[in-house]
């Protein structure tokens, strides 16, 4: 979003305590319009969910599309061994929840742009939500494709409420497995002591209903095992398989964080710099309701073996 450079600061306004908070709240010295005024210039989008509902409606005909952008090979960077396993495992986990999974291996920036724009242009009216997963080498705010760098926000910008109306008011979930810098987490040792009938129209921010889950905190390395896959994606698959239909998404992601933080540690004894290092995922949520994935009873892959995957957390690790 861009700020209007013609705006000028307004005099300081005193806040008055009142039950109607929306009428008294003001931005920090910038001109604004009340939310109800926006309906004069913006066509309202009809949603089959009450503005006061605590959960997203996840009972539509389709669960939705899940895009997986799996960057494995690069022109001038190491091959991301283990990422194919991540993509395969994640496809199985998401298919079990009813998603239409589409995998793109080693896409160029041009291909990524085309895929995102064409998916945004689809009619998602009968879909519950959208998922986009990107797995690659990365830097802070940037991801590497086969041929170039691209900004991470390119993943969600085509799907904001003002650009993809059929997904407005629905959860749009983004999972990013990539480094976000070169810092290493040494870790800290812990010693344990003992249905509504309201027919109202309302507006929502364009960036509402988005969640971005990063594999690591900004500025830090993200870890991947060449044989068993990346820590973050494997932990995500395990939690989706075990609790994908019972826990709300943010609770589930908290347990993904716990798995990565506690169950994993790098093992590179011949290189002290990279040995015995830790990782913690980072979640940015603009969700406005709880996200659940109830059983659709329609997925063709419901019969996939739901067994848990073994993890080898103390084997040679490589940085994503």
Q: Where are the language model's segments positioned?
A:
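Cysteine endopeptidase catalytic domains of the caspase/legumain-like
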Residues: 1-320
């Amino acid at each position: 979003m861009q700020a209007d450079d013609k705006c000028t600061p307004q005099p300081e306004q005193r806040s008055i305590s009142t039950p109607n908070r929306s009428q008294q709240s003001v931005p920090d010295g910038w001109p604004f319009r009340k939310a109800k005024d926006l309906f004069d210039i913006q066509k309202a989008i009809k949603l089959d969910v009450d503005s006061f509902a605590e959960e997203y409606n996840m009972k539509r005909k389709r669960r939705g599309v899940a895009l997986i952008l799996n960057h494995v090979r690069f022109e001038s960077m190491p091959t991301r061994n283990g990422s194919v396993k991540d993509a395969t495992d994640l496809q199985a986990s998401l298919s079990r929840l009813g998603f239409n999974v589409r995998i793109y291996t080693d896409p160029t920036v041009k291909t990524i742009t085309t895929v995102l724009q064409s998916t945004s242009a689809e009619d998602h009216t009968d879909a519950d939500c959208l998922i986009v997963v990107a797995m690659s080498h990365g830097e802070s705010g940037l991801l590497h494709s086969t041929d170039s760098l691209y900004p991470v926000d390119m993943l969600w910008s085509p799907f904001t409420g003002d650009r993809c109306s059929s997904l407005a008011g629905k959860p749009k979930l983004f999972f990013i497995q990539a480094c976000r810098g070169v810092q290493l987490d040494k870790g800290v040792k812990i010693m344990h002591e003992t249905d509504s009938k309201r027919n109202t129209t309302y507006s929502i921010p364009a960036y509402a209903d988005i969640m971005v889950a990063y594999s690591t905190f900004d500025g830090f390395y993200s870890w991947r095992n060449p044989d068993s896959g990346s820590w973050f994606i494997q932990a995500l698959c395990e939690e989706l398989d075990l609790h994908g239909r019972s826990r709300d998404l943010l609770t589930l992601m908290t347990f993904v964080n716990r798995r990565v933080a506690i169950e994993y540690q790098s093992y590179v004894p011949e290189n002290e710099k990279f040995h015995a290092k830790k990782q913690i995922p980072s979640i940015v949520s603009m969700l406005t309701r709880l996200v659940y994935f109830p059983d659709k009873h329609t997925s063709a892959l419901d019969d996939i073996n739901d067994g848990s995957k073994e993890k080898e957390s103390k084997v040679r690790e490589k940085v994503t």
